[in-house]
């Protein structure tokens, strides 16, 4: 293991001792804010320190076994050879575990997201494919016990969506979906195609973490234009009688968000403001993320919206993710919500990139 990583582990061990003492301090116990903060840090550090202690014990066992290799008794030497082999394997596994635990955590991984799907090139076929993608993510959300709430939708003339925006709420939503941003391409024969020719169309997907109150960008009300209109979305006859839908334009950036799915104008405004904050946050962080990805020549994790990330080929039943050269012949299962088959290899590749950079 690299010396820089061992230094980090020594620092964490010292910090763990400090935290143990602090959590037993009467002054800290009486201050609930400090006590909760230290408790959270303790919970994060404790498993790493415990595993590091195990690593040090196994290193000691290895040194003892290696000393026995010089023993005059051939039986002892034979036993020591086997013990050295097993202990070295243990060390490899423990080091790999510790490296994964030391990877920098994305503070957004546990957040809910705003999922934006827009039809691109391909006209009606692109809109139909937007609908396919939205159903795919909705089914995936069902499998994971997440809740999907449509905020805004613009349906296509022959099905699907020209644009659909949803909020996805649940456990580690952003951590799972963050690499879905980009251009998704579909190749298939449209139902209206009499010659059986394959058409290519595309949609763009954007996954934005929902900011919390501390993370939310401060927005000057003077920079906003707020319009109300009658919703064409869910809610039945009630929404047709009131201007409950909200459209907010952020004048300095030109970003427009709208929410029409709630009956309450107040709720629609709150959702729209949260989405606007997410888009402004994304605007700030995307440039930095792209610069880092470019510098390290990363494909996974760049989040470039214009990057073609995946192709769905219906005649071949094939899904190809171009970032990790992954090809699966299980298109129906993926579209039915089995997106983990694509997501997990992407997360593994990203983790490998992080491990390569760790300790540099």
UniProtKB/Swiss-Prot annotation:
Where is this protein localized, as stated in its record?
Answer: Cytoplasm
Report the GO terms under cellular component.
Answer: cytoplasm
Indicate yes or no for the key word Acyltransferase: no
Q: Which InterPro entries match?
A: PCRF (IPR005139), Pep_chain_release_fac_I (IPR000352), Pep_chain_release_fac_I_sf (IPR045853), Prokaryotic/Mito_RF (IPR050057), RF-1 (IPR004373)
Q: PTM comment for this protein?
A: Methylated by PrmC. Methylation increases the termination efficiency of RF1.
User: What terms describe the molecular function in GO for this protein?
Assistant: translation release factor activity, codon specific
Query: What gene is behind this protein?
Result: prfA
Q: What does this protein do?
A: Peptide chain release factor 1 directs the termination of translation in response to the peptide chain termination codons UAG and UAA.
* Annotated positions of the N5-methylglutamine modification: 237
Q: Does the keyword Protein biosynthesis apply?
A: yes
What residues form the membrane-spanning segments?
A: none
Please give the Pfam families that the UniProt record associates with this protein. Answer: PCRF (PF03462), RF-1 (PF00472)
Instruction: Give the Gene3D superfamilies listed for this entry.
Output: 3.30.160.20, 3.30.70.1660, 6.10.140.1950
Q: What is this protein called?
A: Peptide chain release factor 1
Indicate the family of this protein: Belongs to the prokaryotic/mitochondrial release factor family.
